[in-house]
Swiss-Prot record:
Record-stated family: Belongs to the glutaminase family.
Organism: Agrobacterium fabrum (strain C58 / ATCC 33970) (Agrobacterium tumefaciens (strain C58))
Full protein name: Glutaminase
Superkingdom of origin: Bacteria
Pfam family, one: Glutaminase
A Gene Ontology molecular function term of the record: glutaminase activity
Keywords of the record: Hydrolase
UniProt GO BP: glutamate biosynthetic process; glutamine catabolic process
Residues the record lists as binding substrate: S64, N114, E160, N167, Y191, Y243, V261
HAMAP family documented for this protein: Glutaminase
Keyword field contains Hydrolase: yes
Enzyme Commission number(s): 3.5.1.2
Subunit-structure text: Homotetramer.
Length: 309
């Protein structure tokens, strides 16, 4: 039996001298205000126990990590037809690249780059008003984490809406190819709000637990997705979850994961645990600098890498 709390504490101790490393995302004004000298880690094991250290109870903007939850909703709604509109291949380009999109006729490379996530949001929006789609996501994440206090930070959403020119360009470009079915402002309104979900490491580690437990949420006992779908979402997180740093993350950490420019990373150790780390300073490819290091240390200490201990 592993001493998970001991491992979590030792990782936190290792990160303490390095607080403040990396560069906070400054192109979203609200994120630029976040104190970089923070680090939190939470692990929720498949028996439902959560272990925390550091700033694990401080809410932060989960940003692109929300794409995992939106993809889960879209697959529940549209099934495999989702893949008619978005691919499943790593991009090798920056998360907001428009060049690849033009070359591939408006079909984004995968659901975790911005263009792909916007298409996924468009699918979830089908049959809904924007407010209803936002509400559906919020209810879903609260249900997964078993926590009704999770909320959306409207200030962050407005900040993104005011500065998200590249996302407007991507959305209009895909609309011109017929791969966006709703008005751009509706789809992006939902997208900016989903990215502004505010969660703690503890909440996020619980929300991702269904992916570590064959699609079943051990907190509620309910099946969220099939075993097969959980496996496939994990596969996409492993290959595409960290922008053009996905290969490097697989090499060093060896766990399915999804990062966000708010400094969070949600990772999955299938059969063992769901993990959330957060530190606002980002590395050169937009992933949490300390978060990535902490997960590499975790994989080494636990032997949880999907490629073997």
């Amino acid at each position: 039996m592993q001493d998970i709390q001991g491992i979590v504490d030792s990782i936190y101790d290792s990160m303490l001298p390095r607080l403040g490393e990396g560069k906070v995302a400054d192109y979203i004004p609200e994120l630029a205000k976040v104190d970089p000298n923070q680090f939190g880690i939470a692990i929720t094991t498949v028996d439902g126990t959560t272990y925390t250290a550091g700033n694990a109870l401080v809410p932060f903007s989960i940003q692109s990590i929300s794409k995992v939850f939106m993809l889960t909703l879209a697959l529940g709604k549209a099934g495999e037809t989702v893949w008619n509109r978005v691919g499943r291949e790593p991009s090798g380009s920056s998360f907001n690249s428009i060049v690849q999109l033009e070359h591939e006729h408006g079909i984004p490379r995968n659901p975790f780059v911005n263009a792909g996530a916007i298409v996924v949001t468009d699918i979830v929006l089908s049959g809904h008003q924007p407010r209803e789609a936002i509400g559906e996501l919020l209810r879903f994440v609260r249900y997964l984490a078993d926590d009704d206090t999770i909320s959306i930070d409207d200030t962050v959403a407005k900040s993104e809406q005011a500065t998200g020119f590249r996302n407007f360009a991507l959305a209009n470009f895909m609309r011109s190819f017929g791969n966006l079915h709703h008005p751009v402002e509706h789809t992006l309104g939902v997208y900016f709000h989903q990215c502004a979900l505010s969660m703690t490491c503890a909440q996020l580690s619980r929300a991702g637990l269904f992916l570590a437990n064959r699609g079943r949420n051990p907190l509620s006992g309910h099946t969220v997705v099939s075993d097969r779908r959980a496996r496939r979402i994990n596969a996409l997180m492993l290959t595409c979850g960290h922008y053009d740093g996905s290969g490097d993350f697989a090499y060093h950490v060896g766990l399915p994961g999804k990062s966000g420019v708010g400094g969070g990373i949600m990772a999955v150790a299938p059969g063992n645990a769901s993990i959330a780390v957060w530190s606002p300073g980002l590395n050169k490819v937009g992933n949490s600098a300390l978060g990535s290091q902490a997960l590499e240390l975790l994989a080494t200490k636990t032997g949880w890498s999907v490629f073997g201990a």
